[in-house]
Amino acid sequence: MAVVLKPWTVLVALVLCLLVCLGTFVDAYPPKPENPGEDASPEEQAKYYTALRHYINLITRQRYGKRSSPEGVMSELLFGDNSEHNQRSRYDDSYMW
């Protein structure tokens, strides 16, 4: 006997999966440090500015690597992680007659 799912149950399951996936993106960035206010002590202000500088460095950090160029990303998507494919052309193979 086949089980038939109602359309609303599929929609509810899809929405729940989407919420779980979006929840993982929220945890990806560190929380912004709280401002201690105008009447805070100099030690608290220094601690806040250190935490703020660390937060800004984390958020604006540049990612360097072998896939930093758009061509590298496209070649990896099209050909996989095989670096030999980029180095050889199709005319390098010798034809055997």
Swiss-Prot record:
An annotated GO BP: neuropeptide signaling pathway
Signal peptide interval: 1-28
UniProt keyword Signal present: yes
Modified sites of kind Tyrosine amide: 64
Pfam family, one: Hormone_3
Propeptide: 68-97
Name by which UniProt lists this protein: Peptide YY
Species in which this protein is naturally found: Anguilla japonica (Japanese eel)
